[in-house]
């Protein structure tokens, strides 16, 4: 562990989960849902010390009486007041540090609106008075974590999926592709197809139950049509899940129909390409000389790549798209759920990175737009 006195803080603000900790650590200290919950009902017990808002795990545990909101949608902050609450919670309750004493490394999805970055920078310096900060691209950090400098990262979280080709440490911006289809859309889709089975999930709290079902029971089929046939002819693929009230529900083909949507977005009524095609298209936008290295270093990262069977399916789909002699290797590190954070921890503790920070002084001289000059 780096010296905690001056260690940089690494905060990976995902659309679904916030991962936070100290640079130099090998895993985040705090991982909690990026949720702000507000009571749906009037408090009647005087002196109960009810709060007007709850953040993270506390909101999750009281979800039955709260309306849950995610301030980050598709990787873009849509509610800055709630976002500030999440950061405040991160620094003061989870990490128990004073942000004015530590440099802060934040992460962002590529191709985000410029205003999003500027506002993040402004809040860090003006609200939390950080001495220095930096905004890094999520996928680039995942590649650092895998110990590579060349490869294409397919990063899929709760809010956004993106493919970023990186060569010798340089991201190739013209070839970055982004798909606004990720874990949250899969959760919504699972809610929908479970309704067809006669199980109704509607509230924001029930959506969290469905997310848990998704995380525990879903998997990616190697051959979708064949799997559908198997599911229709036998009950071998059925699994049961116990709801919080003790009721047990059974799910069958929903287990693989749900994540199939990232390979076939038409399931969600979207016109975009699946993740395999997006990855392929991204490689094809790169110079012909470096494609071979990208095919051989396709790195998966993010929570939505955690489904069993996803690496084999990617291998199969990309092999079908690529030239027949091409060697294709899909790298799916076991810790890929946190690889963005781990990469941030590595980056912020490199001695060569120390001159990259945006200092409070630079911010005061140039204003929020400094972030575009100093952070790729």
From Swiss-Prot:
Domain of life (superkingdom): Eukaryota
Catalytic function, reaction form: ATP + H2O = ADP + phosphate + H(+)
SMART domains the record matches: ACTIN
Free-text description of this protein's post-translational modifications in UniProt: Oxidation of Met-45 and Met-48 by MICALs (MICAL1, MICAL2 or MICAL3) to form methionine sulfoxide promotes actin filament depolymerization. MICAL1 and MICAL2 produce the (R)-S-oxide form. The (R)-S-oxide form is reverted by MSRB1 and MSRB2, which promote actin repolymerization.
InterPro entries tied to this protein: Actin, Actin/actin-like_CS, Actin_CS, ATPase_NBD
Modified positions (Methionine (R)-sulfoxide) in chain numbering: 45, 48
Annotated Gene Ontology cellular component terms: actin cytoskeleton; actin filament; axon; cytoplasm; cytoskeleton; dense body; focal adhesion; membrane
Entry EC number(s): 3.6.4.-
Described function: Actins are highly conserved proteins that are involved in various types of cell motility and are ubiquitously expressed in all eukaryotic cells.
The protein's name: Actin, cytoplasmic type 5
Taxonomic source organism: Gallus gallus
